[in-house]
Amino acid sequence: MLQNYLCVAAYLFCIGIYGLIISRSMVRALMCLELMLNGVNLNLVAFATYLDNQEIKGQVFAVFIIAIAAAEAAIGLAIVLNIYRNRNSVRVDQFDILKW
């Protein structure tokens, strides 16, 4: 049973990495980053359930990761929205704002 959860978690994480490498849109990159964090959450919960059913350490870490991911998504989308207002594009290859 643990192997099924770990395979799904690894699959989610790999899809997130692939999307992060391939995507040219910042919004899509943020979505892929969230997918990677969901794979990590599934991994933590699966190991916590498999190793010790009585303690909820893995679930607590997963809740913290979900909270951090929500803050990361809000800040990331605010940055993307600000860049879109200034540049009219959210493509990563056209992002040269930090160049002087």
Swiss-Prot record:
Pfam families the record matches: Oxidored_q2
TM ranges: 2-22, 29-49, 60-80
Main localization of the protein described in the UniProt heading: plastid
Reactions listed under catalytic activity: a plastoquinone + NADH + (n+1) H(+)(in) = a plastoquinol + NAD(+) + n H(+)(out); a plastoquinone + NADPH + (n+1) H(+)(in) = a plastoquinol + NADP(+) + n H(+)(out)
Enzyme class: translocase
GO cellular component, one term: chloroplast thylakoid membrane
PANTHER family hit by this protein: NADH-UBIQUINONE OXIDOREDUCTASE CHAIN 4L, NADH-UBIQUINONE OXIDOREDUCTASE SUBUNIT ND4L
Family annotation (HAMAP family): NDH1_NuoK
Family under the similarity heading: Belongs to the complex I subunit 4L family.
Oligomer status and interactors: NDH is composed of at least 16 different subunits, 5 of which are encoded in the nucleus.
Full protein name: NAD(P)H-quinone oxidoreductase subunit 4L, chloroplastic
Lineage of origin: Eukaryota, Viridiplantae, Streptophyta, Zygnematophyceae, Zygnematophycidae
